[in-house]
Swiss-Prot record:
GO terms for cellular component: chromatin; ciliary basal body; cytoplasm; cytosol; heteromeric SMAD protein complex; intracellular membrane-bounded organelle; nuclear inner membrane; nucleoplasm. It comes from Homo sapiens. Changing T179V: Reduced phosphorylation, increased transcriptional and increased antiproliferative activities. Further increase in transcriptional and antiproliferative activities. Changing K53R: Slightly decreased monoubiquitination. InterPro entries: Dwarfin, MAD_homology1_Dwarfin-type, MAD_homology_MH1, SMAD-like_dom_sf, SMAD_dom_Dwarfin-type, SMAD_FHA_dom_sf, SMAD_MH1_sf. One of its GO terms (molecular function) is nuclear mineralocorticoid receptor binding. The modification N6-acetyllysine is found at K378. Zn(2+) binds at C64, C109, C121, H126. The lineage of its organism: Eukaryota, Metazoa, Chordata, Craniata, Vertebrata. This is Mothers against decapentaplegic homolog 3.
Length: 425
């Protein structure tokens, strides 16, 4: 490998030789600076040999390699900030790593990032990639009775939802602007995995599907499996009660919806360029405050929403609401710099398996759970002047395609005609 910067120490060259993935010239320079920065820190603490041993042997049974934890948990390398364990795991193991949500520390790691100690371990072999759990197939009895018409779907559009604030126990992330590396998705901020799990999983339904009820034991049971679609969600943008622009189809595991005027791409849905002849002054003012908007992650069968805007976002997620024991229509305020788990595939799978035992209508009602509504800047509900989502100036609706298609297959197996599942707006 040719020297990128003059006077590259031999140890840095050796470590760069183990780098994964191909980068352009600018990115190669940044990688070298990241390695030089780490080498400089480890020389002072005598851990350099252990780093080289871990990288060259690719062995988990190496020691923790630690650097001091900064105040906000991030490491700055050449005007770019990121979480240190993510930076070095991406550099030496997974060049396609998007976020710390994709990493889980090994049990043997004594200074894992999520432990919030004064030192943080950056040994890339002390972390493992979170794998998407395989969802068990739903066993569906084949019914002969086809419903004459679909039951009415629970519709939260015209009721006044309750309001709640960001769940206590989740620390807000530091809201420091960052410059993502070219071709990479930027890391999100600092949230303790332990705290996230403790708070988010409270009240979760039992994740093991219930066995079929005795009444179904003698029926012909057909397994209906979950299939991951090419586009994990579809996003529609609304101003008041009018849909604006085309539906965005998300294929990337991390993408943003923002208020800027850049052309949209697979990782960004930019609302700034969308025109609407009926746009009023209130909508125009709100659009100016969307800013960096919201980042959506789909990782390990879970969906997270992170507020990047300087103003709060407001989320109505029936799946999240069930986890907390709230009313299904509750709207949760997410302050700037915080993120919230808004959907969990395993929880949905358990609910679907239980609902099959309760009949067609119970399964059909889960359609509403696959739709998430989110408003920018202005909230709605009982505590706000605007009491319905269609009264908010700027909002989006997410349709989770995998769960919706799974529902469609289950309903078809139960005896319904094939339908296009959608929410009632």
């Amino acid at each position: 490998m040719s020297s990128i910067l003059p006077f590259t120490p031999p140890i840095v060259k050796r470590l760069l030789g183990w780098k994964k993935g191909e980068q352009n010239g600018q990115e190669e320079k940044w990688c070298e600076k990241a390695v030089k920065s780490l080498v400089k820190k480890l020389k002072k603490t005598g851990q350099l040999d252990e780093l080289e041993k871990a990288i060259t042997t690719q062995n988990v049974n190496t020691k923790c390699i630690t650097i001091p934890r900064s105040l906000d948990g991030r490491l700055q390398v050449s005007h770019r900030k990121g979480l240190p364990h993510v930076i070095y795991c991406r550099l030496w193991r997974w060049p396609d790593l998007h976020s710390h949500h994709e990493l889980r520390a090994m049990e043997l790691c004594e200074f894992a990032f999520n432990m919030k100690k004064d030192e943080v371990c950056v040994n890339p072999y002390h972390y493992q990639r979170v794998e998407t759990p395989v969802l068990p197939p739903v066993l569906v009895p084949r019914h002969t009775e086809i419903p004459a018409e679909f039951p009415p779907l629970d519709d939260y559009s015209h009721s006044i939802p309750e309001n709640t604030n960001f769940p206590a126990g989740i620390e807000p992330q530091s809201n420091i602007p960052e410059t993502p590396p070219p071709g990479y998705l930027s890391e999100d901020g600092e949230t303790s995995d332990h705290q996230m799990n403790h708070s988010m999983d409270a009240g979760s339904p039992n994740l093991s599907p219930n066995p079929m009820s005795p009444a179904h034991n003698n029926l012909d049971l057909q397994p209906v499996t979950y299939c991951e679609p090419a586009f994990w969600c579809s996003i529609s943008y609304y101003e008041l009660n009018q849909r604006v622009g085309e539906t965005f189809h998300a294929s990337q595991p991390s993408m943003t919806v923002d208020g800027f005027t850049d052309p949209s791409n697979s990782e960004r849905f930019c609302l700034g360029l969308l025109s609407n002849v009926n746009r009023n002054a209130a909508v125009e003012l709100t659009r100016r405050h969307i800013g960096r908007g919201v980042r959506l992650y789909y990782i390990g069968g879970e969906v997270f929403a992170e507020c990047l805007s300087d103003s709060a976002i407001f989320v109505q997620s029936p799946n999240c609401n069930q986890r907390y024991g709230w009313h299904p229509a509750t709207v949760c305020k997410i302050p700037p710099g915080c993120n919230l788990k808004i959907f969990n595939n395993q929880e949905f799978a358990a609910l679907l398996a239980q609902s099959v035992n309760q009949g067609f209508e119970a399964v059909y009602q889960l359609t509403r759970m696959c739709t998430i509504r989110m408003s920018f800047v202005k909230g709605w509900g009982a505590e706000y002047r605007r009491q319905t989502v269609t009264s908010t100036p700027c909002w989006i609706e997410l349709h989770l395609n995998g769960p919706l298609q799974w529902l469609d297959k289950v309903l078809t197996q139960m005896g319904s005609p094939s339908i296009r599942c959608s929410s009632v707006s």
